[in-house]
UniProtKB/Swiss-Prot annotation:
InterPro entries: DELLA_N_sf, TF_DELLA_N, TF_GRAS. This is DELLA protein RGL2. One of its GO terms (molecular function) is sequence-specific DNA binding. Coiled coil: none annotated.
């Protein structure tokens, strides 16, 4: 008969044959015994981390009991009153669960007195029974004993037929989600402990569970499972990152879909632009250095705001940094030409210069051709600084360059997460919570076109792959929190600029216009503005000036 979750089980190993008189067991016999013990221990460990209270050596006995149970259930003489209201707890404890059902079915007379019987083992079947507590805060481990017990009801789900009564087991999606999360964390723990055999078995289990889990949880688990598999098999380098290898501009295309699908990038651009506008209120010439131009989506809105300024718009000079171009492409200049057309329509005097750089740490002050006597200088970075943390000294080199050109304001937008820790398991747990919130917010945007949603998920999935599977200089998605960036910026000689209540109110208004889900939140925290989903902040905008 079928086993739980479609798995099959081998009977316990047979005893070794007795050795001949005067002879000890052969080396082959010893090796076979060791292999059997190792396999048995491996199965026991896998069953434990997946929440089943049974050993592989007990599976033959459990299978025999299940066959007896099937024979009893197929008997039409079994009174329906025994089945209808029976409640059995803890099916993860296979042996006791089957034993309790057989015991009740073999004593149907007692059901007249109490139609609800239970076999309860509360110590092992809640979330604490499965390894991976680090995925859940300890203060949330409060359970109502009656409400939290998992039940399988027989009778109401069993339909009699002329042939036999068949039991249908319905798997609760919430319980599957819990098992999925715990299997993910258990796999990460196995990798952390360098138990790659167990990790390999668990990542396959995650793939099976993820395939049966609908919604955001199933999607994010699939990306994490792929990343864990790449780490287990050591199959990740910058060269094997398929999306980047196909075309460096592919990520820019993905980012455009992410921009359209949710308010995070809109919030980033809007709040940074608000800080810039307040810093250049009286300036007649504005020079913005964008450390990551991408598709230039941030700047039309700023030019439009400058065009509406009383007394006429200032001149606007934009220096955009981008990756090195291919031989037959000059996308930076093409983008500059499009922005120039837009500026002309707005009546804004515009000048553009594109700079190609392998790394932002390669930039030197003289490359920017600043005009301090006549221009107000602005430096802008959206999701760029964290990439420099992959190489020692790179972020310090860039910040020293920025400091040397003496900007009036530096605007910084970064992910509000700590994915730069040296301990893999901590980084994994943080990433699992962070990206689960992002995927959940995408799933809640019910009016989102399917193409935008899918491409946005790919955009985030690439980040998950890098955070989990990569190491060394290949791991560039090294996000840090606002508190961590505050320490870095202050040590480099910058002081924070408080983003005031006006920016907060306008950001909240923007959110009401563009956000399709009702779980988005804007908050002000220590002079920074944050956007998040439900109670979790996800993106932070901050502004800085020379100390």
């Amino acid at each position: 008969m079928k086993r739980g979750y479609g798995e099959t089980w081998d009977p316990p190993p047979k005893p070794l044959p007795a050795s001949r008189s005067g002879e000890g067991p052969s080396m082959a016999d010893k090796k076979k015994a060791d292999d059997d013990n190792n396999n048995s221990n491996m199965d026991d460990e896998l069953l434990a981390v997946l929440g089943y209270k049974v050993r592989s050596s007990e599976m033959a006995e459990v299978a025999q009991k299940l066959e007896q149970l099937e024979m009893v259930l197929s008997n039409d003489d079994v009174g329906s009153t025994v089945l209808n209201d029976s409640v059995h707890y803890n099916p993860s404890d296979l042996s006791n669960w089957v034993e309790s059902m057989l015991s009740e079915l073999n004593n149907p007379a007692s059901s007249d007195l109490d139609t609800t019987r239970s076999c309860v083992d509360r110590s092992e079947y809640d979330l604490r029974a499965i390894p991976g507590l680090s995925a859940f805060p300890k203060e949330e481990e409060v359970f109502d004993e009656e409400a939290s017990s998992k039940r399988i009801r027989l009778g109401s789900w069993c339909e009699s037929s002329d042939e036999s009564t068949r039991s249908v087991v319905l798997v609760d999606s919430q319980e599957t989600g819990v098992r999925l999360v715990h299997a993910l964390v258990a796999c990460a723990e196995a990798i952390h402990q360098e138990n790659l055999n167990l990790a390999d078995a668990l990542v396959k289990r995650v793939g099976t569970l993820a395939g049966s889990q609908a919604g955001a949880m199933g999607k994010v688990a699939t990306y994490f499972a792929q990343a864990l598999a790449r780490r287990i098999y050591r199959d990740y380098t910058a060269e094997t990152d398929v999306c980047a290898a196909v075309n460096p501009s592919f990520e820019e295309v993905l980012e455009m879909h992410f921009y359209e699908s949710c308010p995070y990038l809109k919030f980033a651009h809007f709040t940074a632009n608000q800080a810039i506008l307040e810093a250049v209120t009286t300036a007649r010439r504005v020079h913005v250095i964008d450390l990551g131009l991408n598709q230039g989506m941030q700047w039309p809105a700023l030019m439009q705001a400058l065009a509406l300024r009383p007394g006429g718009p200032p001149s606007f000079r934009l220096t955009g940094i981008g990756p090195p171009q291919t031989e037959n492409s000059d996308s930076l200049q093409q983008l500059g030409w499009k922005l120039a057309q837009f500026a002309q329509n707005m009546g804004v005097e515009f000048e553009f210069k594109g700079l190609a750089a392998e790394s932002l740490s390669d930039l030197e002050p003289e490359m920017f051709e600043t005009r301090p006597e006549s221009e107000t200088l602005v430096v802008n970075s959206v999701f760029e600084l964290h990439r420099l943390l992959a190489r020692s000294g790179s972020i310090e080199k860039l910040l020293n360059t920025v400091k040397a050109i003496k900007p009036s304001i530096v605007t910084v937008v970064e992910q509000e997460a700590n994915h730069n820790g040296i301990v893999f398991l901590d980084r994994f747990n943080e990433a699992l919570h962070y990206y689960s919130s992002l995927f959940d917010s995408l799933e809640d945007s019910y009016s989102l076109p399917s193409q935008d949603r899918v491409m946005s998920e790919v955009y985030l999935g690439r980040q998950i792959l890098n955070v989990v599977a990569a190491e060394g200089s290949d791991r560039v998605e090294r996000h840090e929190t606002a508190a961590q960036w505050r320490i870095r910026m202050k040590s480099a000689g910058f002081d924070p600029i408080h983003l005031g209540s006006s920016a907060f109110k306008q950001a909240s208004m923007l959110l009401s216009l563009y956000a399709t889900g009702d779980g988005y939140r804007v908050e002000e925290n220590d002079g920074c503005l944050m956007i998040g989903w439900q109670t979790r902040p996800l993106i932070t905008t901050s502004a800085w000036k020379l100390a």
